[in-house]
Amino acid sequence: MAIRKKSTKSPPVLSHEFVLQNHADIVSCVAMVFLLGLMFEITAKASIIFVTLQYNVTLPATEEQATESASLYYYGIKDLATVFFYMLVAIIIHAVIQEYMLDKINRRMHFSKTKHSKFNESGQLSAFYLFACVWGTFILISENYISDPTILWRAYPHNLMTFQMKFFYISQLAYWLHAFPELYFQKTKREDIPRQLVYIGLYLFHIAGAYLLNLNHLGLVLLVLHYFVEFLFHISRLFYFSNEKYQKGFSLWAVLFVLGRLLTLILSVLTVGFGLARAENQKLDFSTGNFNVLAVRIAVLASICITQAFMVWKFINFQLRRWREHSAFQAPAVKKKPTVTKGRSSKKGTENGVNGTLTSNVADSPRNKKEKSS
């Protein structure tokens, strides 16, 4: 996000700058229209599609279960309207966090433009990852996923979801869809847009795939696992911006990143490659939401494996580049040993050295600051 300069003159109404400065208020007014529509009988039927979850089914109580009937949900085309409304909510929450939390910290810390953008990105994502991780863990515990891992593939297709499960997926889709207009609202640099589009697109592809293919149980577990690792990275980057000597969080993140990729592959192969492959019903049936056929299973495993390989390749490539730059920087310091300035040069080499762990950005490290200034 670019640093906004305060001006005494207010921009013209509906101008480019006006929309950027007041986009949260504009979106709030649009969301308020849907909420006000619930108050009138004529518009209530249309507004309720946007605000509440659709496609609920009430199942009668059984002797083994509780005496009360259960209300479950499945997905449909009307979910797009619900996702749109909560996308507006995500934009509003994004603006609130930015204005009342991150901007205040930025004024105190006096970050550079590069750090300002990275700090805002990590601040927003760490808040989202923490919330989604806690929420997802609550669903896993309440629905006994931890005590019985076979629930990941047993009784497939999982076309009926609880309220918490469906609302979780609707919220995930809404959040990552809101990231597209945020690229405009936050004045993202053109060179950063392709990276952001790939980043957002991968999230939407996998979340929507798990939702539409009725693999919501597996998708929930993998999302919680991935969000926890990503939360650790972004919270470590926030601490790094406040104190550049902080590196322990990145070292722990590097270990958990590799473990997270391995667990993702193990759970995916165990669920799709073994659990669903041994299921009795392996016929494609759109009416019941059964996609347990060989072609779909191969496509699911291929997409997961390719994505994990891409993430590991980016991780290894970044680490190798950092270690190569660290070695190249230390080599001249070892060769040059002037007698007069020996103590001074060795001190500079220690200050500018990098320990090889992953930091927030190569441009943000103290060593690169030294190179830029020179």
Curated annotation (Swiss-Prot):
SMART domains from the UniProt entry: TLC
Region Disordered, annotated ranges: 334-374
Post-translational modification: N-glycosylated.
Its membrane topology: Multi-pass membrane protein
Sites of Phosphoserine modification: S365
Residues carrying a glycan: N56
InterPro entries cross-referenced by the UniProt entry: TLC-dom, Translocation_assoc_membrane
GO cellular component: endoplasmic reticulum membrane
Basic residues composition bias: residue spans: 334-347
Membrane side Cytoplasmic: residue ranges: 1-29, 98-121, 181-192, 236-251, 319-374
Assembly and oligomerization: Interacts with SEC61B. May interact with Derlin-1/DERL1.
Protein's recorded name: Translocating chain-associated membrane protein 1
